[in-house]
């Protein structure tokens, strides 16, 4: 029998950590209340996030929202909010989501102080962060200690199986989704059973599938116009289904702890290239969409030229690394070029264009015209170099094109190669 209490004990903050967080939170709230009152600001500080809900794991952050009256214009609200954030976090740095906010540390605890507008259930939001205090209220009102521990178990399970985290780089399940799922199904075990039997998309409530098209549809209990599961990828939904099936077949504690994965290097008989460039100093949520876009463009170029791409991988640290695996990286001297169907109005024009240029043809196969022509660009390296000059790889990456390197893999030490050869169900 699996010992959930032991697992929770390994991940749940102890009394000392909880007391320290409470003292820090109380101190921040008091200082904010004092300065808000002294400056006659129509706002109030609110503790949100997993700590305030009682669903946090060890080493959690503190999220303090300053909720403003809607009488303040957006620019003024943000300006006041940032000044209050810097008042609390003297060495804090400004970060940007939909609203700018201040992030820093107090006694080695990460603190985010976020300005937002105060809204009531059903009211129109100005930005997505405005819902967050309502999320906190919803979870507190709909959970008891047992459910909160089951929420923790689900978070632990998802983290260990690499499907937790709503950031763009992960595209997994957020903490709020874990809370909604456990509240909906009443226990951790019921959530796992649901995933193990799920066919197709996840849709809660079941009649919401037509309204939203994403793989995971979980209507936000505080805002029926929002799909809280929109960020979850089909791959991570699939991974969670498999993890749940495997867990129910063999219930053991290993499903709640990170697995050590070692690369399994082997000869593949393919051609592997690494495209590298320096990472710009911008946040993950901005850089990752550009890297994913660049990866897709490289793959599509390889396919269009006929290098027969097999797979790809990315890794983003201090450098951006994109791996592309090809069945071949050099093309033959002759390429077969497809023309229009013979029934097309363009068929005669195609013949006239190619009759004196083709190495062979034009000729017909079934109902289409073809020619054999000389391959102009034969190597993947040359093709990608040519295409890079005109490729749009995103606002921030475009500025770094001159620093892009294209390297043919030959047992070189790249993080993306380790990641590629470590790939399994959960990685």
UniProtKB/Swiss-Prot annotation:
InterPro entries: CAA_C, CCA-adding_arc, CCA_tRNA_nucleotrans_2, NT_2-5OAS_ClassI-CCAase, NT_sf, NuclTrfase_I-like_C, Polymerase_NTP_transf_dom, tRNA_NucTransf2
Top-level lineage group: Archaea
Keywords from the named record: ATP-binding, Magnesium, Metal-binding, Nucleotide-binding, Nucleotidyltransferase, RNA repair, RNA-binding, Transferase, tRNA processing
Binding site for CTP: 50, 53, 135, 155, 164
Binding annotation for Mg(2+): 61, 63, 112
Binding site for ATP: 50, 53, 135, 155, 164
Cofactor(s) required, per the database record: Mg(2+)
GO biological process: RNA repair; tRNA 3'-terminal CCA addition
GO molecular function: ATP binding; CCA tRNA nucleotidyltransferase activity; magnesium ion binding; tRNA binding
Catalytic activity: a tRNA precursor + 2 CTP + ATP = a tRNA with a 3' CCA end + 3 diphosphate; a tRNA with a 3' CCA end + 2 CTP + ATP = a tRNA with a 3' CCACCA end + 3 diphosphate
Enzyme class: transferase
EC number(s) recorded for this UniProt protein: 2.7.7.72
Job description of the protein: Catalyzes the addition and repair of the essential 3'-terminal CCA sequence in tRNAs without using a nucleic acid template. Adds these three nucleotides in the order of C, C, and A to the tRNA nucleotide-73, using CTP and ATP as substrates and producing inorganic pyrophosphate. tRNA 3'-terminal CCA addition is required both for tRNA processing and repair. Also involved in tRNA surveillance by mediating tandem CCA addition to generate a CCACCA at the 3' terminus of unstable tRNAs. While stable tRNAs receive only 3'-terminal CCA, unstable tRNAs are marked with CCACCA and rapidly degraded.
Other facts noted in the record for this chain: A single active site specifically recognizes both ATP and CTP and is responsible for their addition.
Subunit comment: Homodimer.
Family label: Belongs to the tRNA nucleotidyltransferase/poly(A) polymerase family. Archaeal CCA-adding enzyme subfamily.
Protein name per the record: CCA-adding enzyme
Lineage, broadest ranks: Archaea, Methanobacteriati, Thermoplasmatota, Thermoplasmata, Thermoplasmatales
